């Protein structure tokens, strides 16, 4: 059972060189992802006079986030595992693939990467508004939580199937592409309703820069619940019993 493999970790992990390298890698990957993803939305709005919320804007956001996440995961895979998402890190922790100590380090790096990316966007665009996540008219907070749970479940299930599963074989090569694709597809499904975050850090950066925190908890609760469910289901049903080990940095 995954619960038996959950590890708090030792304080010494905080000062280990590999942990520091992994944190820097997560910071940079998140910066790349948020700068390209959020920046594409800002550029589309500028070019279309505020058309970022149109169907074409949704398609552009889906494509930009899919491509950016593919790159962000790929460049971080050999160093940190390329989580680029606090929910993915939480799913790895629930499945016994990363210690709590190291997970906290990842979370801090991911959140900082998102904030810095949004600040750089604001500076580079001369003060243009960075789009914060919000619920569309008629969408309640708990409706959005369900959206985030289901979408993040799909994301983390994909992560486990293509990157974490020790039986993945050559399938691991396409992990960054598959992960980017599921995020892009989910944006097409949920973007019009709650922005389709699936990633607390992606929501956190714009909230810090804009000061808009309305329903921000939705973008933490939903992804964390979805990630935990996916990790438990995949680990219990498809991976089964195995000794506790750290998430291999060579794959994800």
Swiss-Prot record:
* Keyword Transmembrane helix part of the UniProt annotation: yes
GO cellular component terms, alphabetically, are: membrane; vacuolar membrane
The name on file for this protein is Probable aquaporin TIP1-2
Q: In which tissues is it expressed?
A: Expressed in leaves.
Give the organism, scientific name: Oryza sativa subsp. japonica (Rice)
Per the annotation, the residue ranges of the short sequence motif NPA 1 are: 85-87
Family annotation (PROSITE patterns): MIP
Q: Which UniProt keywords apply?
A: Membrane, Repeat, Transmembrane, Transmembrane helix, Transport, Vacuole
The membrane-spanning stretches of this chain are 24-44, 57-77, 115-137, 144-164, 173-193, 220-240
Query: Where in the cell?
Result: Vacuole membrane
The taxonomic lineage of its organism, from the top, reads:
Eukaryota, Viridiplantae, Streptophyta, Embryophyta, Tracheophyta
| Topology class, membrane | Multi-pass membrane protein
Q: What does this protein do?
A: Aquaporins facilitate the transport of water and small neutral solutes across cell membranes. May be involved in transport from the vacuolar compartment to the cytoplasm.
Q: Which residues are in coiled coils?
A: none
Protein induction: Circadian-regulation. Expression is higher during the light phase than during the dark phase.
| UniProt comment concerning the protein's domains | Aquaporins contain two tandem repeats each containing three membrane-spanning domains and a pore-forming loop with the signature motif Asn-Pro-Ala (NPA).
